[in-house]
């Protein structure tokens, strides 16, 4: 039941932030590709200053820096003419990628915006796989530790 509530909350949060729930699930699957035993939404949501919705201040560690870089990548995507959030973009249509072993490959058939977002997610997932996870940074008091 708790997982169902979490899934609903994440879907609402994703929709509110302009990212379709499908895009969030794709990013989750990418993380599971490179970290097979992980539970991305439970482990990485509300981690540090940047993992989850929003972000501010200085990242608390390498993993949090991965999330900050991912946020910045999405900000860059929004500046692309092909990502002007009309009808054909990865926020409303999913991108194509494959996972073989722990290798993620974004499809060459993706359009420019889809390819950009796919690579944002791919690079973040790989970054997550290389960064240590510090349980003390989960559900961090962002008002105390993440002010600019």
From Swiss-Prot:
Matching Pfam families: Phospholip_A2_1
Q: What is this protein called?
A: Phospholipase A2
What quaternary arrangement does the UniProt entry report?
The inactive pro-form is a homotrimer. When anchored into the cell membrane, the inactive homotrimer is likely cleaved either by trypsin or by itself, producing an active trimer. The resulting conformational changes are thought to open up a center hole forming a channel for substrate entry. Interacts with PLA2R1; this interaction mediates intracellular signaling as well as clearance of extracellular PLA2G1B via endocytotic pathway.
Q: Which residues form the active site?
A: 70, 121
From the UniProt record, report the name of the gene that encodes this protein. Answer: PLA2G1B
Family from the record: Belongs to the phospholipase A2 family.
Query: PROSITE patterns from the entry?
Result: PA2_ASP (PS00119), PA2_HIS (PS00118)
Q: Where in the cell is it found?
A: Secreted
- Whose protein is this, by species? Homo sapiens
């Amino acid at each position: 039941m708790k997982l169902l509530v979490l899934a609903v909350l994440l879907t609402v949060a994703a929709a509110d932030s302009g990212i379709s729930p499908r895009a969030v699930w794709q990013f989750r699957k990418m993380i599971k590709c490179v970290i097979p035993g992980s539970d991305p939404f439970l482990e990485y949501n509300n981690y540090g200053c940047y993992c989850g919705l929003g972000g501010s201040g200085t990242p608390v560690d390498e993993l949090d820096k991965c999330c900050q870089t991912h946020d910045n990548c999405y900000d860059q995507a929004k500046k692309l003419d092909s990502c002007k959030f009309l009808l054909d973009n990865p926020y409303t249509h999913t991108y194509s990628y494959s996972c073989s072993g722990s290798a993620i490959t974004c499809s060459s058939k993706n359009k420019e915006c889809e390819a950009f977002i796919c690579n944002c997610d791919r690079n973040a997932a790989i970054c997550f796989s290389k960064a240590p996870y510090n349980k003390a940074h989960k559900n961090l008091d962002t008002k105390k530790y993440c002010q600019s």
